[in-house]
Amino acid sequence: YIYFLGENQAHLASVYFSLHDPHCFDARVGVPSHPLSRLIQDLKHLPGVTKYALLNSRFHPPQNTLDAHRIDAVLDTLETLVQAGCLQGIVYVDHYLLRALSDRNPDLCARLQAVPGVNCLLDSLPRIAHHLECLEQTAFKAPEKIVLDRSLNRDRKALDRIASQSRQLWPNMHLGLLANEGCLPHCPFKLAHDSSIALGRMDPAQEQTRAMNTSLGCARSFVHDPSLLLRSPFLRPEDIHAYAPSIQHIKLSGRTRGARIMRRVIDHYIHRAYSGNLLELMDTQELLADRFVISNQDLPSDFGQRTMNCALACYACSYCRDLAKRHVQDKGVRIKPMWA
């Protein structure tokens, strides 16, 4: 996988990786652990790519953020990565953690960007501005890029307005969108879902995120109303070009699905085309790819154009519901996904 990324460095704005630290979590479960030496060895194969460590759990237990020894252990790992030339910044969601790191080693933090994670839900200029203002109270450098909230994938007017104002206020900061996390529109489960992941990272024996999603959460909603699969604010490979120049990069998710599948996801977005079950391209919706099929190549050619400025006002529109009747196939039984 790392050699594949190296061959495609020209297409990469940045890469993200977990520290696999027991006191500082990322926002994913089920990611295989790698020793720091192996991580550095792999990252050195990407010399021209900006590298960010994921410290983006929704929250951390107070005993981690208030304990100087535990914070120092995290900082030691960051220092090792910086010295190896393999780290330019961190991705965070928990501001308590950000301040704890900055207070303990401001000199190190002054060499690192602090990038608000996509789960900070940056959907407006005031929200962006206040996050950056809070960041200014730490030693960290301002981010060179941020990823905006998923809702803006389907609200082009708001996106263009934010992009225009951001260029005036922060001319050196690039904007991006998360392309392939196919969750519910303005997902009501989002904060609880993130918190469930955080709790599972603190105590892996209590990890129940997938069971919660399938029995009580978003996966259950998709089964109840399959039109939500199309109403989800994803960006297809064929449609991302239309978002320039408001954004300068896209983020692709799915680390827990493994390197083989991530290679395919990245390749389809590089080539701006995909033929197959749309759900297999998506992170989250892939849970349902063994039951539902949406042939991406059969969707209307203007699907992206029709949905990029709908503002997710599904209460006043039937476009995706009508499409779902023709394009969402419910097999009714579990089948093995093509990418399994």
Task: Locate predicted features.
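Active-site pocket-lining/capping segments in soluble small-molecule metabolic enzymes
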Residues: 1-131, 142-251, 255-340
